[in-house]
Structures are given as structure tokens and as C-alpha cells.
Amino acid sequence: TDVIVAGAVDFPEGKLSLEEKMAEFSRYSEKGFAEIDYTLNQQAIERRDFSAIELEMKTIADFCRENDIRDKAIVEMCKLDGDLAAKKEICQIANRAKPAFLKTSTGRSFGGAKLEDVKLMRQMLTADICIKAAGGIHNYEEAKAFIDAGADALGASAGIAIAEGEPK
């Protein structure tokens, strides 16, 4: 079958320990999940604990590569607004850890995807890391702007409105 199974770990909170997340990833792997979105530890993000963020992202990315799973590491870039250096450091961590995707947001925080974040991510990330823009994408024009800015995938609850808004 061409149907893939996707899931989410620690979504949207980002509160689980790495050990708890890995237990979930193992269960999902055993069940044959092909894609898993997960929220990076938000306390580490807020503290700018880059070593903890890198350990988490690398451990999960390595596991996913070994088990043929596409991982999508969710940052919540809005929590880093006003801290360009932190946003760049997250991108450098991703370049070393190599998740399949770096995702802007859960779409459930106080801020969703922002064009300037996607542009920065595309500028900073190596070509083998995909970008998923999620949260606050409501129509075709916004969706196209995020794709033009460098997003490889979109997360939006307005998928039908986006598709129906495409100019004919």
C-alpha cells in the first residue's frame, strides 16, 4: 500500500524527558510508523540549553535514520523571537544532528510560522534538511509565500481553503 502511518511524540507540550521520548519512538517504530513529528524540550529552548537540545535532536535523528523513519523536530521559533543568535544556533544544531525536517511550530503556541523564520532556516540549513512551516497559514497566498521562502512542507488546518484558493 502507498499509505504511510505518521504520528506525534510529546505534541504539543515538549515536556517529556529524552528517555520518555525514546520509549515512544521505539513503540511507534515497532508499529511501523513512517513519519513522526516531535516537539523539542521547551524548557531547554526557553533556557537556551543548546547542549540538551543537540543531544535530544541527534539521539532522535540517529534512531529515526536507523529505523527508516522521517523525523520532524519542532522548535517553536516564536519562543526565540528577538534572539536571532539562538535561532541560528538551532539551525546549526540541526545541521549537525540531521533531522529529516526542522519544523517552525506546533501551530498551538502563541505564534505560528513566520516568513522571516523560514527564510532564515532555508539560508542556514543544509539542503538535505527539509523545512515544515506550520501554524497560521490560512490561504493560498500565505501558503505560496511560505513555499517561495523555502518551506518544503506546510502544516495547516485550512488545507481545503488553501487548495480552493489557488488561482485557476
Region spans (language model):
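Glycine-rich phosphate-binding active-site loops on the catalytic face of alpha/beta enzymes
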Residues: 31-45, 96-111, 135-168
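Active-site cofactor/substrate anionic-group-binding motifs, chiefly glycine-
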Residues: 1-35
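Residue-level signature of catalytic and energy-coupling elements of molecular machines
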Residues: 28, 73, 102
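Alpha-helix-loop-beta-strand connector modules within alpha/beta enzyme cores
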Residues: 1-11, 50-74, 79, 88, ...
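Short histidine/acidic/glycine/proline-rich micro-motifs that form metal-
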Residues: 11-13, 42-44, 77-81, 108-109
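Short acidic/polar alpha-helix capping motifs at helix-coil junctions
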Residues: 23-24, 53-57, 83, 108-109
